[in-house]
Swiss-Prot record:
Gene3D superfamilies: Jelly Rolls (2.60.120.10). It comes from the Eukaryota. SUPFAM superfamilies: RmlC-like cupins. Glycans are attached at N58. It comes from Brassica napus. May play a role in plant defense. Probably has no oxalate oxidase activity even if the active site is conserved. GO terms for cellular component: apoplast. This is Germin-like protein 1. It is found in: Secreted, Extracellular space, Apoplast. The keyword Flavoprotein does not apply. PANTHER family: GERMIN-LIKE PROTEIN SUBFAMILY 3 MEMBER 3 (PTHR31238).
Length: 207
């Protein structure tokens, strides 16, 4: 009998997605591996399903670029849907540094300007393309990729992800904005210690 109850409970859990139209996240509760708990449907409003990416981000920073996320933490209606979005703004010479999204593939749609984008495969093959407004490029899950403003005017793009929480790790920050000792970073990157110290100083790392 206990085995039957367990199997029925498991079946209900696995089929939960098919019996709920949506699950707007209750951000006051803790996130679980399955996402956030749902707000009760009677408390959900039409405005919960709307999010704005119409305002350009502030590009006055070290990378001359801005990312405005529309992940589940900002757009709770995405909870459980397996998708998310963001806006990229790049000033002239702006760059989204080499980075990965461990939890999602990415599709980039150029709105304005010219963006050179690319990724590196697990076989170290490089795929680079300069994109114009209206063009789209895909970046497979977990692969290193980047975007650079290739023009002399501001550029903007929308990106979508195959997860509500795609994750983000920027390579430069992972290497140099941490507390790992200069000696270890130097030994594992083959960079001179002086270069490592300089990069740590620029990006806020120590050690």
């Amino acid at each position: 009998m206990l085995r039957i109850i367990f199997l029925l409970s498991l079946l209900f859990a696995l089929s939960n997605d098919s019996v709920q139209d949506f699950c707007v996240a209750n951000l006051k509760r803790a996130e679980t591996p399955a996402g956030y708990p749902c707000i009760r449907p009677i408390h959900v409003k039409a405005s919960d399903f709307v999010f704005s990416l119409g305002t350009p981000g502030n590009t006055t920073n070290i990378i001359s670029a801005a990312v405005t996320p529309g992940f589940v933490a900002q757009f709770p209606a995405l909870n459980g849907l397996g998708i998310s979005t963001a806006r990229l703004d790049l000033a002239p010479k702006g760059v989204i540094p080499m980075h990965t999204h461990p939890g999602a593939s990415e599709v980039l749609f150029v709105l304005d300007g010219s963006i050179t984008a690319g990724f590196i495969s697990s076989a170290n093959s490089v795929y680079v393309q300069t994109l114009k407004p209206g063009q789209v490029m895909v970046f497979p899950q977990g692969l290193l990729h980047f975007q650079i403003n290739a023009g002399k005017t501001p550029a903007a793009a929308l990106v979508t992800f195959s997860s509500a929480s795609p994750g983000l790790q920027i390579l430069d920050f992972a290497l140099f904005a941490n507390t790992l000792s200069t000696e270890l970073v130097s030994a594992t990157t083959f960079l001179p210690p002086a270069t490592v110290k300089t990069l740590k100083g620029v990006l806020g790392g120590t050690g």
